Amino acid sequence: MDAMQKTIEYTSVSRIAGPLMVIDGIEGIAYGEIVDITTPNGDKRTGQVLEAREEIAVVQVFEGTSELNTSETKVRFTGDTAKIGVSYDMLGRIFNGAGKPLDGGPEIIAEEKLDINGYPLNPVSRNPPNAFVQTGVSTIDGTNTLVRGQKIPIFSGSGLPHNKLATQIARQAKVRGEGEQFAVVFAAMGITGEESNYFMDEFKKTGALEKAVVFINLADDPAIERILTPRIALTTAEYLAYEKGMHVLVILTDLTNYCEALREIAAARNEVPGRRGYPGYMYTDLACLYERAGRVKGKEGTVTQIPILTMPDDDITHPIPDLTGYITEGQIVLSRELNRKGVYPPVDILPSLSRLAGNGQGEGKTRDDHSKVISQAYAAYAEGRGLRDLVAVVGEEALTERDRSFLKFADAFENSIVTQGVDEDRSIEETLDYVWDLLTILPREELKRVSDELIEKYLPKK
């Protein structure tokens, strides 16, 4: 678009439907272009081109289409895509879903203005995810180890304490090593006012805000803003990582609300729906978010992602968790059964998995016994869980002494490893020591996954 076209104001709005506006008689317009809109009473609004064909543009209005009409509304196409002004000074600040200050502080003086959609990374320019990120949560650090540059979602359900876990991770997360800079970018989408107050209070009172950038999109904010929020958050994270050399953990919650916004916009455009009414391009759209995690050759910083989503009806085969699982490198699953028992965080380690855990475990990263002792504990816990079903049928009296020891181990594992205080920050060494303590419950001959050398070095003497 040339300079002359940027000055043209169109009044050829032909149709307004929901958050969308159709403009006729235009030319030289591109997909994703930002639009300045003047309402009949002179107010300014912003929109984005969702579709451009022949002489027609379909524009999504960020602030909604109330008070707009087809005869007096003026539209100007800017020729620019959606951009966010980024700066190191964003650390310690809270913004709304569109990147405007929400904490009463001044506007950010941008060091750079970046396209919120990011830029495609050549796969050859990526380094494999590597090195340990400590969250202070045993069920993540021990069994589902998080690695710098990884993307691993948390699959939750309505009413489960994923918000509490998200703030705990944001507060406690750190990278090990001298001189390493670490930051958290936290983006909440489609949340209630109560949840917003909870997040802001938690970040402020615990001091976590000092190393964090927070973006909050409320449930009553426009759907298009919900689409922008994670992109703005990831653009901020990429700037801090690749321009400032920081290791950045991005927490996105709740991706289910994001996907509902995708469905709402697709329905307004009369698109042919895919599975359960979601647009057919939802897989591609989610991949555009998740694939922005990683490590880049020649850059010091990294971007690590923990997207959180609530599974509708606790259905892990629902399109949102299903498609997410194809793109990401594992999953952390919260259990309603454990939550009913009063276990916090209610992480069920059996269906949970970190496919890159091995890249962050071992000597020089965590400890030399990490992978072996966790493998032993995982196997013992799985056997103990299976024995619970048997006990429900035949009773505990029918079990052998060996079986009873595994049953006891499973109970102890849930009570001392899985269960953890919301303010309890465990180092990886503490987590592994707790696991070794529990292994004393089992007969020595059952410790088949750890070497004699590791047993002599770490297993407490009875």
Curated annotation (Swiss-Prot):
Q: Does the keyword Nucleotide-binding apply?
A: no
- Would the keyword Ion transport turn up in this protein's UniProt record? yes
Q: What is this protein called?
A: A-type ATP synthase subunit B
What is the protein's known function? Component of the A-type ATP synthase that produces ATP from ADP in the presence of a proton gradient across the membrane. The B chain is a regulatory subunit.
Q: Which organism is it from?
A: Methanococcus maripaludis (strain DSM 14266 / JCM 13030 / NBRC 101832 / S2 / LL)
Q: Which residues cross the membrane?
A: none
State the membrane topology. Answer: Peripheral membrane protein
Question: Main site of residence?
Answer: membrane
State the similarity comment: Belongs to the ATPase alpha/beta chains family.
Q: PROSITE patterns, alphabetically? A: ATPASE_ALPHA_BETA
Query: One Pfam annotation, family name?
Result: ATP-synt_ab_N
Q: State its location(s).
A: Cell membrane
Q: How does it assemble?
A: Has multiple subunits with at least A(3), B(3), C, D, E, F, H, I and proteolipid K(x).
Q: Which HAMAP family match?
A: ATP_synth_B_arch (MF_00310)
Keywords tagged on the record: ATP synthesis, Cell membrane, Hydrogen ion transport, Ion transport, Membrane, Transport
One of the record's GO cellular component terms: plasma membrane
User: What InterPro entries does the record point to?
Assistant: ATP-synt_VA_C, ATPase_a/bsu_AS, ATPase_F1/V1/A1_a/bsu_N, ATPase_F1/V1/A1_a/bsu_nucl-bd, P-loop_NTPase, V-ATPase_su_B/beta
